[in-house]
């Protein structure tokens, strides 16, 4: 299946990607990466497997267009990554946890889109601010109940010694 496929995406200190079936017959000016086999693979996240250097993973579209996080049926990547310090990893933990509040807020706001549009159309700034305050309070309360993201000791050891892509 993969014989003669090209590594069509190479990003220094991050990953190399292959598996586009169109790359088998592509000329040297072809844009690659869009080929597929007509199916995806359901998301499978196993905590003991993470994006350390050398990890093999199935490629997928971003969460914004792929909320189920399904993987490509044919494309894959190998993590090349780079090394990170413990303080960099600690900062990433903080950023990831802070971003979670925004994600929760946005999820809640999407449920109120009709209401938001009506208030915008009516120039109801007081109503918009009240709804924003309410959603921020709800997002914060929901966030406080969630388990916070934290790198495991194994992840810290790998990312500080051999490297990887901890942001994935």
Describe these PLM feature segments.
Residues 1-168:
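Cyclophilin-like peptidyl-prolyl cis-trans isomerases
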